[in-house]
A protein has these predicted regions:
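Core pore-forming/fusogenic effector modules of secreted, proteolytically activated toxins
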Residues: 6-61, 99-204
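Membrane-inserting effector segments that mediate pore formation, membrane fusion
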Residues: 54-108
Length: 204
């Protein structure tokens, strides 16, 4: 066996997995785009005249930019994400300007800056991202296939809701409803879908 300079046997290198062909075709399925809750603060009650919201948003979910392979030869993750971005319109002809294909992209900080409320109420601050997830199949001319799932996110933001007021236009799956159920309680008016007051929401 080969030895290192110190006389110790060198570890045998494991053969790398064979890469997939470079001119294959992607087929995408189950493409899902939705806003997901990434952090929420404990509810905070303010008296008449309002005041500053000081409860810190606690992380619940860390957004990912990643490719998980199920079977077949591995493909460059950035190439997979570039194909997904082209499919969803998040990567244009001029390239990736948002970090959609960057597997080293840092997750957004769920903590928000100080927010001042003008009136009384019980408030909850929360953060969210718009996430894109899809399954793919990559097929080479020889018929060899690779399959897996790609995940990325395109925008992040934050919002403030009032527990006793339904969120305007809220639907099942909305981050505002998830935040209300988490911090206000499942029976709070803000936790139910329906018409109500607009949520205070700011995208970054």
């Amino acid at each position: 066996p080969a030895c290192t300079s110190g006389g110790e046997p060198a570890a045998r290198a494991r053969p790398a997995a064979a890469p997939a062909c470079g001119n294959g075709v992607y087929t995408w399925s189950d493409v899902d785009r939705r806003s997901v809750l990434t952090g929420v603060a404990e509810k905070q009650t303010l008296g008449e005249g309002g005041g500053a919201l000081t409860h810190e948003v606690r992380p619940l979910r860390t957004p990912r930019v990643a490719v998980d392979f199920d079977r077949g030869p591995r493909i460059d993750a950035k190439a997979v994400l570039r194909s997904l971005g082209a499919r969803t319109g998040d990567v244009g002809a001029d390239g990736d300007a948002t970090g959609f294909t960057d597997v080293h992209r840092p997750a957004p900080d769920p903590r928000t800056g100080g927010t001042e409320m003008e009136g009384a109420g019980t408030f909850v601050t929360y953060s969210w991202v718009e996430q894109v997830v899809a399954d793919f199949q990559y097929t080479c001319g020889s018929g060899e296939r690779s399959t897996g799932r790609a995940t990325s996110w395109v925008v992040d933001g934050s919002g403030v809701l009032e527990c006793s007021v339904p969120v305007e236009g809220a639907k099942e799956g909305d981050p505002a409803l998830a935040a209300a159920r988490f911090s206000c309680g499942p029976h709070a008016p803000a936790a139910a879908p329906g018409e109500g007051r607009p949520v205070r929401r700011a995208s970054s």
